[in-house]
């Protein structure tokens, strides 16, 4: 009778290796960042975002708009533009910060937006203007949506600012 113990051990090792190779993609997929959609909605935010322990999380401080009219009073809305203009300026700054870290807007998993009531909108935050700027960066060509909160605040540290945005980004 032949000794099959070495052959049996080799077969078991090969089977274990094959199983590991077959399961590896499933395990890697289980570790992906998951964006949970809002049921029955096409609104461009995520209901929630799940981040695996293998991801690195980056907290980006609140960013404010750049000056768009250097001739205007630097403490006036005219210096920074309307809510849409300010939103685009702030998100462009965030995009540049992320790029400097090897990240992109698709890596943003959480966003907090602070909008000041706009005198041109009877003291209410211009959410329509904000969304017009926001959707240039999220929900179109770049489909990854963050969990997001938008709140109206009494004011920001410069009376010309209508928008401040802070984000959290994550990448495996």
Task: State what each model feature region is.
Residues 1-10:
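N-terminal secretory signal peptides that target proteins for export/translocation
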Residues 12-92, 96-112, 118-172:
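N-terminal presequence-like segments and the immediate start of the first folded domain
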């Amino acid at each position: 009778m032949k000794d099959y113990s070495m052959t049996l051990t080799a077969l078991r090792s090969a089977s274990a290796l094959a199983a590991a190779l077959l399961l590896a993609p499933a395990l890697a997929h289980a570790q992906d960042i998951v964006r949970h959609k809002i049921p029955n909605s096409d609104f461009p935010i995520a209901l929630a975002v799940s981040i695996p322990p293998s991801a690195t999380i980056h907290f980006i401080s609140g960013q404010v708009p750049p000056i768009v009219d250097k001739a205007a009073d630097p403490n006036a809305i005219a210096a920074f533009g309307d809510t849409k203009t300010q939103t685009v300026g702030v998100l462009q700054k965030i995009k540049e910060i992320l790029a400097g870290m090897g990240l992109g807007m698709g890596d943003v998993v959480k966003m907090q937006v602070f909008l000041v009531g706009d005198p041109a909108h009877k003291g209410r935050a211009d959410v329509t203007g904000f969304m017009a700027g926001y959707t240039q960066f999220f929900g179109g060509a770049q489909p990854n949506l963050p969990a997001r909160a938008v709140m109206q605040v009494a004011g920001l540290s410069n009376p010309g600012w209508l928008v401040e945005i802070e984000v959290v980004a994550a990448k495996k």
